[in-house]
Amino acid sequence: MRNKPRIRFKGFTEDWEQRKLSEVVTINPKTELPDKFKYVDLESVVGTNLLGFQVIKKENAPSRAQRLASYGDVFYQTVRPYQRNNYLFANIDKDMVFSTGYAQLRSKLYNYFLLTLVQNDNFVKVVLDNCTGTSYPAINGSELGKITVQIPSNDAEANQIGKVFRGIDNIITLHQRKLEKLKLAKKALLQKLFPKNGSQFPEIRFKGFTDAWEQRKLGDIATFSKGNGYSKSDLALSGNPIILYGRLYTNYETTISNVDTFVELKDKSVLSQGGEVIVPASGENAEDISRASVVKNQGIIIGGDLNVIKANHLLDPTFLALTISNGGQQKELSKRAQGKSVVHLHNSDLQEVNLIFPLLNEQKEISTLFEKMDNIITLHQRKLDRLQEVKIGLLQKMFV
């Protein structure tokens, strides 16, 4: 077994030590809870960020409220640990209490080194191997303490490593906040540039446009078809670009110009001509599938379980995708989606949607604005992805 990391700071050459986690941290130290405190449950930490807490009295607190935080404690998610929602408590509050869904790790090690250690792939893999349960795999504090870890024999090296990853995480958090602000700005503009509550006039408009918006059924001004075939198992490293329906939720904004998934072309594949608006035909809930994207380029395969809309001369495709995904049209789509564990949306449902739209020139102004915003959002997302890749690479090389 390798006992030295591949990348080290100058001056450190000693082998790393192999220790049980319980030998380097105190797990779930016993404390007395205050009469009133800020309670952090399992949904309150995402990644390494604390999203919020509840202020509650001790007598009203859930039985899981037991871990009173102290400066430097690391709270490790023991239920579904593959999510890696772990938090370093780095403030001086004396009244924050975490759920027993976290293991409380208190150590003399540099605390950011410890946080990074428990986020590492190697550690998470061993934890999962020792979990019980399938739907909600979990590990208790006793079993967690038995896990073997490798740490520097010199505390100064651990401190240096921790500082590197603290800096990287701070930069990642900054980019995440910028990205979230951009998405919120887009959402706010969508609410103001499209009419609400049955009105024919939006709250704000581009200069020179004053006419009322027109209302028509989507089926009167567009044609409809379906994508065809393909699943995740068909994906390849290269070949013909393809849009799979599941990636509409996570990988694409309103406009799709660049596609990073590929397959080998099959017979009867549906290829884009440019300007198709695609809407998921199924999903886990109505909100997921009540959204649309426009395929900008030709020659992209449109996979199965996608409804395909081709607008006529009255509609700009990007505008159509925007209006389907927001406001009254999105609410109408949500109501038409049918199903329980899986909901479905058919072209026949789309045809009945009441669409409200302005003249083509105003549509294009709106589309151009949001295409520019999407480009900026995509650019920031790529920067964030690259930073996360850098972090993963360093984790692999700076830990044993």
Identify the function of each model-found stretch:
Residues M1-E17, I147, N154-E214, N361-V400:
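Amphipathic alpha-helical segments with low aromatic content
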Residues D35-V55, Y71-F98, Y112-L117, K125-D129, ...:
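Short, ligand-facing micro-motifs at secondary-structure edges
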Residues R2-N3, M96-G101, T132-E157, I300-L306, ...:
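A short glycine-rich beta-alpha junction/loop motif
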Residues R8-T31, R205-G227, E352:
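Non-catalytic DNA-recognition/assembly elements of restriction-modification systems
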Residues S22-P29, E43-Y71, G219-S231, G246-E276:
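Sequence-specific dsDNA recognition surfaces
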Residues I7-K10, A103-R106, K146-Q150, I204-K207, ...:
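Short, well-ordered beta-strand elements within core beta-sheets of diverse protein domains
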Residues V45, L144, F194, L248, ...:
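Hydrophobic pocket-lining residues within nucleotide cofactor-binding pockets
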